[in-house]
Amino acid sequence: MNKHIEQLYRSAKKRSRLIIGLMSGTSLDGLDVALCRIEGHGTDTQIELVAFCTVDYDDGYKQKIKSVFAKRQVDLQQVTLLNPWVGVLHGQMVNQCLEKWNIAATDIDAIASHGQTIYHCPLGQHGQSEFGNATLQIGDADHLAVTTGILTIGDFRQKHIAAGGEGAPLAVYGDYLFFTSKQENRILLNMGGIANLTFLPCSADASAVFSSDIGPGNTIMDAYVQRHFSPLHYDKDSAMASQGKVHLGLLDSLLEHAFFALDFPKTTGPEVFNLDYLSVAQAHSATRQLAHEDVLATLNLFSARTIANAINDAAIELEEFNVYASGGGIHNPLLMEHILRLCPNVTAIQDTSKLGIDPDAKEAVLFAILANECLVGGQQPFGNLEQGIPNITMGKISFPD
């Protein structure tokens, strides 16, 4: 038997496994590295977040990725070069974290790598029925495995599309397995570059679970700050947005996109919601000369309105439910204030630390869960294709030699 197959067998038989989850989102701020000790599988999954850090990306990384990110036409040579380069760089970042934590690579059972999304293109976006849904992540897992010496599981989204999904959101699998409660209805809200939610009924009925993208979280706000307030990367503590005044005409123009009228589930990305989208909305509302602070105030409420509308729609038939939030948006006080005000049935929005997971680490942890299911799961089927949740095992395995 191949030694790596033996290693897979040994890892699967362990009472607990050490799995590193990696997440690099559309915000391009850094690589989230979550070291998880995981016991069990399926709905019996137990997780301890042993260590977590975000390794910041430097400006060179951001510029290279932005040259091919969310663009219909790019330099194909650059994409080809970046695919292994990102894999090696992410591997080096994992090595840095392991050294910082004083943990040997040989102690790790697997790395779960999301990679770096550079283009997400569901059928509803491109409209070419012969091609169906599509998405592309770079950061080759073989290069990551060789760089770290650790078995790596990656490229999770392709199986989701192959089985009838849109490749996103994948959070629903980990949310269902780890965060479902028999005591309360829950909405898991994640606010990264793009916001998404997962609805988890206390019945734990898989047919009632759904997950969907909502629209822009931080993506347009961050891009606007980076363009007009360089070298700042985001509106810290919503300081600039708090100084501005919402322009209702611009807000109405931003809310006109057909995506917001689509039923759940649906997916989107910065390919749609970006500075070009803002520019068109400003042209329609004659607000090209609006003060930067007023634009940021309006963008903040725009994100909040779409998020609140989604929460209200998801829970329309519920008398009681709780919202648990994660992602960079939880650090935006004005955004959180708007969402709470616009959700009359929500008395408080708690972050996922209340459920035992650092809200900044949640997405990386969820990919560790997917890797664990790839290794030892499959005995408890979970899926609902009508809600875009195919019953599948995701991830491709890359050996370190």
From Swiss-Prot:
UniProt xrefs under SUPFAM superfamilies: Actin-like ATPase domain (SSF53067)
Lineage of the species this protein comes from: Bacteria, Pseudomonadati, Pseudomonadota, Gammaproteobacteria, Alteromonadales
Keyword Transferase on entry = yes
Q: What class of enzyme is it?
A: transferase
User: What does this chain do?
Assistant: Catalyzes the specific phosphorylation of 1,6-anhydro-N-acetylmuramic acid (anhMurNAc) with the simultaneous cleavage of the 1,6-anhydro ring, generating MurNAc-6-P. Is required for the utilization of anhMurNAc either imported from the medium or derived from its own cell wall murein, and thus plays a role in cell wall recycling.
Looking up CDD domains in the UniProt record yields: ASKHA_NBD_ANMK
UniProt lists the family membership as follows: Belongs to the anhydro-N-acetylmuramic acid kinase family.
Q: Which gene encodes it?
A: anmK
Can you name this protein? Anhydro-N-acetylmuramic acid kinase
